[in-house]
UniProtKB/Swiss-Prot annotation:
Known role: Involved in the biosynthesis of branched-chain amino acids (BCAA). Catalyzes an alkyl-migration followed by a ketol-acid reduction of (S)-2-acetolactate (S2AL) to yield (R)-2,3-dihydroxy-isovalerate. In the isomerase reaction, S2AL is rearranged via a Mg-dependent methyl migration to produce 3-hydroxy-3-methyl-2-ketobutyrate (HMKB). In the reductase reaction, this 2-ketoacid undergoes a metal-dependent reduction by NADH to yield (R)-2,3-dihydroxy-isovalerate.
GO annotation (BP), single: isoleucine biosynthetic process
Active site per the UniProt annotation: 124
Protein name: Ketol-acid reductoisomerase (NAD(+))
Keyword Lipid metabolism appears in the UniProt entry: no
Broadest EC class assigned to this enzyme: oxidoreductase
Keyword NAD appears in the UniProt entry: yes
Binding site for Mg(2+) 2: 208, 244, 248
Organism per entry: Desulfosudis oleivorans (strain DSM 6200 / JCM 39069 / Hxd3) (Desulfococcus oleovorans)
Keyword entries, A-Z: Amino-acid biosynthesis, Branched-chain amino acid biosynthesis, Isomerase, Magnesium, Metal-binding, NAD, Oxidoreductase
Reactions mediated catalytically: (2R)-2,3-dihydroxy-3-methylbutanoate + NAD(+) = (2S)-2-acetolactate + NADH + H(+)
Gene Ontology MF term list: isomerase activity; ketol-acid reductoisomerase activity; metal ion binding
E.C. numbers: 1.1.1.382
Family: Belongs to the ketol-acid reductoisomerase family.
Amino acid sequence: MPTINFGGVEENVVTSEEFTLKKAREVLKNEVITVLGYGVQGPAQALNLKDNGFEVIIGQLEGDAYWEKAIADGFVPGKTLFPIEEAAKKGTIIKMLLSDAGQVAVWPKVKKCLKKGDALYFSHGFGIVYKDQTGIVPPKNVDVILVAPKGSGTNVRRNFKDGSGINSSYAVFQDATGRAEERTIALGIAIGSGYLFPTTFEKEVFSDLTGERGVLMGCLAGTMEAQYNVLRKHGHSPSEAFNETVEELTQSLIRLVAENGMDWMFANCSTTAQRGALDWAPKFRDAVAPVFDSLYRRVKNGAETRRVLKVNSAPNYLEKLRKELDTIKNSEMWQAGAAVRALRPENRKKKK
């Protein structure tokens, strides 16, 4: 396994050049891969596996919208598409790709279907790490493994189709067969991962929950809203406030940072922007550090898990969620955003 230097720290990384798709096919040649859940990660991983020549079946609540989506994607009821319990019985590798709350709901049925030597696969460590709250405690005679793509289901599929793939982390929680790591890496390669980073279930879930609530979404949304509100309070128009807060970030700067790094970005902007950004970055870092410390503590002690399971399991959850999302969508900031997005250069081209 090659090592790569990340900021002065040597880390092991599995590559698709070292562990080829051909090798993955050999490792998984006698496996039936059951994908439980056809919502977010399910379609991408299932279709990538199918396109790479692996035997895949889907387990989904019969007749719901996701069942119909699976049919539209080419899975056939009674052949490659089954109710959840039936699909779990047929598989040798059971991919638990339902929502976290969904996994808790179906676990008692899935557990009864597991056979000695099966592999129970996750793309998120939530159910296993917070077992005291989820009740997900696998039997000792199955492998318990994880491959967590570093991107949404949409990107897992999109990148696979354009040939680039997506990187993933992987972990083994329980090795009952002596083949758990080999199976895990093979499954990571099979869904299109070019590089696989070793982790643990615990580290994956702690970093993932912190990231989602932090920079990736929660902190990002909150910070953008705060700046937009300050600009509006001081008389800037909605379009100007949105452009200076969101549009320049998403359409220009973040792409350049992704390609070249933050040091390059600082070196390739106006001297006024450069000096100001360098001066203010530490202030923002120090201001939000206590919030991140608090967030990480809540993730680690299970407080965030308790909230997720309580709220997401409520009978009126979807109704309340729609109201929350509608409030955001109908806010001045994001209504301004919709108008600004319509004026992007690529949309002007479509009108001609």
